[in-house]
């Protein structure tokens, strides 16, 4: 496929998606649509890789230009916002908590969602080695397509050597000194306790499977809690946090044991609608606010 080019940005562009071909005999329209989209995705993989490479190159060039301009304007000093974050924080402290990313939902995700989950896990690892505090993280039910993604699609990741990160195909979850984090519970997580294991659902499903992690935790007898987001901030857009966000928020909490500060420092500015008045929301909350908190 020959990439189209934008003359202004000189970046490759994928061609508009073609119309869905006639449905083959013996297949439903939804089955054919899913298969055809997958085929188109595979067909365009080389082009998407080229687009990502061009965007990274353009971003590097723009950063060099900003850096050069800043150096000229600041007498040779690099502004704080342009300084790179060290890949590893050598002054890290042990948070004392353990985190499990429960990935036992492979069959409930499509290929793109598996890729998205693998990206979230790698970003969670990056956060775990850069933040001021780290946790011992274990990825359970690491098998099937997710493992294949790491072994084949992320060659060179060397994930089996990641520090404070363990991958296992075992699916068993602890039921003592453990908490399953899910937005579908009414119980709020007040604080993070060293010695406790916090379980995060490793699933990207665009909210198709309601109360999935909550029901699993209940079946296993594991207490459930939700992050106290609604008590401190309000979000705009989809009230969904990635696995990366959840882990990073927990690590940031240990900086000052301040949930509000942790949320504001981690969540993208585009998701922050306005800061909530914690004092008012502690005394009263409307049904809409309660629903928002459960949707997060």
From Swiss-Prot:
Keyword Cytoplasm attributed: yes
Single GO MF descriptor: tRNA binding
Keyword hit for Cytoplasm: yes
InterPro entries from the UniProt entry: MT_TRM10-typ (IPR028564), MT_TRM10-typ_sf (IPR038459), TRM10/TRM10A (IPR016653), tRNA_m1G_MeTrfase_euk (IPR007356), tRNA_MeTrfase_TRMD/TRM10 (IPR016009)
Active site: 205
Record-stated family: Belongs to the class IV-like SAM-binding methyltransferase superfamily. TRM10 family.
Protein name as annotated: tRNA (guanine(9)-N1)-methyltransferase
Organism: Eremothecium gossypii (strain ATCC 10895 / CBS 109.51 / FGSC 9923 / NRRL Y-1056)
Gene name per UniProt: TRM10
